[in-house]
């Protein structure tokens, strides 16, 4: 089994990587959000 990389991260550091504002800051992140909206995801990004 592979190592779970988020197991020892703080909530703040996770948000810095995969929170909504982090997604909006890059073109690739905006593309990700667009895809999740299209699919109908209730939760677009990691919540705090």
Swiss-Prot record:
Entry-linked InterPro entries: Ribosomal_bL34 (IPR000271), Ribosomal_bL34_CS (IPR020939)
Q: Matching Gene3D superfamilies, A to Z?
A: 1.10.287.3980
Keyword Nucleotide-binding part of the UniProt annotation: no
Asked whether the keyword Ribonucleoprotein is assigned, the reply is yes
PROSITE patterns in the record: RIBOSOMAL_L34
| Any one of the GO CC terms | ribonucleoprotein complex
- Cited Pfam families: Ribosomal_L34
Give one GO molecular function term: structural constituent of ribosome
- Localization per record: Plastid, Chloroplast
List the NCBIfam families. rpmH_bact
In the record, the note on similarity to other proteins reads:
Belongs to the bacterial ribosomal protein bL34 family.
**Protein name from the UniProt record:** Large ribosomal subunit protein bL34c
Q: Which organism is it from?
A: Trieres chinensis (Marine centric diatom)
């Amino acid at each position: 089994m592979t190592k779970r990389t988020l197991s020892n991260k703080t909530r703040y550091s996770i948000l810095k990587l995969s929170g909504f504002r982090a997604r909006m800051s890059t073109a690739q992140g905006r593309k990700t959000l667009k895809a999740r909206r299209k699919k109908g995801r209730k939760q677009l990004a990691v919540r705090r």
